[in-house]
Amino acid sequence: MQTSVTAGTVFQDTRKPLRLWFRAMWYVTNQKHGVSALGLKSTLGLGSYRTAWTWLHKLRYAMVRPGRDRLAGIVEVDEAYLGGEKPGKRGRGAAGKALVVVAAQEDGHRIGRIRLRRVSDASAQNLGRAVQDGVDPGTVVRTDGWSGYGQLEALGYVHQVVRQDSHIGENLLPMVNRVVSLLKRWLLGTHQGAVRISHLDYYLDEFTFRFNRRKSKSRGKLFYRLVQQAMAVDPMMGKDIKGAKAKHRTQDIVYT
């Protein structure tokens, strides 16, 4: 029985040579702000936009390391709406909008690592799961006074509620706010804001991968990490990409 070297990896069943995949990963990790499917198609000489689009989503999928460490220490947590023309109502979904929970770890006076997770609404159940997924129990978690965070103490966190006062003004959670601003700028600049909500999770994974490695001076190390993780994640077929067969609908587009 013969087993391909790509079996059980993100490259499984590929018809393209691995060296072309490696070129794609080198190109992706060497572009500071990311790449578009059109840019990848042009750079590699791929036959179709669809192939480039599928490859990029597979690589974004590989950017999440299995069993990755959760945040610890002091972490700010808040939610942000992406897209749509009208402001969303907290605790509820909104047509044409995606609600993302943002967790930012403090590193002195700077932002350390982050975690991003899309949720359907800002209910206590969804917010609790998002925090548990990305933050170690015992961590100091700072939030605003939204009731959806009221169960964090019971979940094993040291919950600190930051309230507006004359000293800090309205910027209650500055690190989270900075991350949200950079995320929106990245979606608008690199992807022209045209990211379907059904595909947003992959873009959040890429932004997290890039942000958490933004201080690395070695592009080669980023390339190595991506290759390493591409070999560690489960296979992903094009048909498995969330929303791959979804029809384009106006409310599925994230405008930031």
Regions found by a protein language model. Name each.
Residues 1-256:
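Residue-level recognition of single "structural anchor" positions
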